[in-house]
Amino acid sequence: GLTGLAGRWMKLGDEPLRVCDTGHNPGGWHYLSSQIAGLHGRKHIIVGFVGDKDVEEIMREIARYNSGARFYFTAPSSHRRLPEDELFSIARSAGLYGRTFASVTEAYEKALAEAGKGDSIFVGGSNYVVGELLASLRC
């Protein structure tokens, strides 16, 4: 369910449903992946990470439940960022496909443009990614 904590399974809007979460480790993604799979419609998943996380394991967790989703790979503006092209390569090795975006905002705007009213958009992977999105939306 939706929590009262900013950035934790936080609902950003409806039609399409938009949710973000700051989960950023394999354990968190084990839970998140099944939560995302339970969202309605086609899933549009925007992810970005910092470079010190076990992204290979996280991508495998995502793929367990969400291999049919549309992915938008990005990176936070932090100096610790995992570049989006590296994330794209890691994701492909886990069987996930999508496109890369230079910024979180660009990825979010593209997902909004492509998602239907009955679809769901998820944004996560790092506190930085969610923070940048919330700042751009002025939440």
Task: Label each region the model flagged.
Residues 1-70:
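Nucleotide phosphate-binding/pyrophosphate-handling subdomain across enzymes
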Residues 17, 59-120:
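C-terminal helical cap/extension that packs against the catalytic core
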Residues 126:
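Active-site-proximal loop/hinge segments that shape catalytic or ion-binding/gating pockets
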